[in-house]
């Protein structure tokens, strides 16, 4: 009896100790608790309004047990280690919150998605290097990593959907009919599809990108994103970068098969579409029939395509609108470094399209090629009009075609020809813009018959001027002579000038200035000839009392300047000759125009001549007024 009783007591003691140990382990282990976005101190209401709760306690998941859903068909799990599944995670009409917790989630079953068939899927990663994917090869491809089923939703806040290789659309994520993806953060990267949408694809669903990165994915069409069959893409933040397509749309591909299946892409905010490439057309964005793309913000830059380095507007059924955006630094081996325009292109508000190039396949030949207007296609202007600080460079297949449809105002200072032999002119009757050459006498008049002094000094009267916008070097001919006219206001970073050269400048109603206050705007020319065929042109407008510049124009020893029009004005300096400084034996001939409102703390507010110089100032017409200096307007 004693032995039995002792044995019973020992058994009870052991069981009690086991119980105490289990309770002790439970009560001291840390709970995995944070907002469903992965942050512990989250206060971002904008990204959370679609979901109810912010603070969540997750239960551990290592892939060895089934996920337990509560009475509301909801579960919260976090990975305790890298997990490789044999079947998909998913449950009908269920909501699943997953924190990757810095681990990898994959599957050995290549014929089914890693995650599938959930009503709502919410993914975050509180650590920062978690990943879903990492499966499939070119020889043994998988299907997409995540399938967002019909009428279901997925929310991505963190983690990577990465390294999936598939032969179906949407290697990373596929959005089914009437389903939605909301991407607030995280990365979709390094996925590869032999079909459309290396990163994300949808047919009749909606892709919403509010943040995060879609990077380095590969597909036949739509390296980063693909939308088809009434689908929609809304991108208001984040980046689409370094994706590659062998066909259309290195970054984004939009394709509607017919009028009832038109697709839509809306791009806004600070979105960046950068560094994407297509072996076919549309390096940044490629459309193919029945697609509407609205770009109301962001930047499209440094993309490459066979046609349409930045954007491909494929056909008459493709509609593009651009406002408050920039398209810069894209390249093509065909036509349209920025945009290949063969459909409908509408611009409004502030649009910057410049610095895009044609680059030959061997890389040896480059030329300015921004918006390429195919055949007789043109640009239209939206209801908001085009702002004065817009800059749109164009190339025409047919130089006799109109560049624009009817514009309510003259935008010839905002729309500029890539071909420097042509300028853009506005016709007030038709309200359209077209190309024209800039030709007139050196004095600025088109009907000049003046044989008096001022014209006999120089040989040519009828001059064809080339456009100069400050982005390219001036080309001088065999006689070391160049003729340039400004297509818009130009601010230089270095002086205009070439030793021993003659430069004819028509200001064409625009301002010529420089951000470099330590160098003249114009310097070191043998002969400088200035005119202004419009009448409001100006050289200067720089320097302050606190930050003075040097003189606007410096004429070297034994050189000459001839002024027929325009104003040398509003220069503030602490050196001689705020407007013009003449070197020894240099001369200033004035037949029109003005030198005014210049200011110096030294001598010659308007013009300064060296005291011992044999040159001088010869005033035949024009105005030197309202300048200020220690000594005189002209000294």
Sequence positions of predicted segments:
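Sec-dependent, cleavable N-terminal signal peptides
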Residues: 1-27
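Aromatic (phenylalanine/tyrosine) cluster motif
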Residues: 8-13, 61, 174, 248, ...
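Extracellular/surface-exposed low-complexity segments
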Residues: 22-70, 74, 325, 348-481
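Intrinsic low-complexity tandem-repeat regions in disordered proteins
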Residues: 31-34, 39, 46-48, 54-58, ...
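Disordered low-complexity repeat/linker domains
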Residues: 40-42, 55-56, 63-73, 108-111, ...
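N-terminal extracellular ligand-recognition/capping segment immediately after the signal peptide
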Residues: 74-96, 100-109, 481-503, 507-513
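Surface-exposed loop/turn motifs in large extracellular/passenger domains
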Residues: 89-97, 114-133, 141-165, 173-192, ...
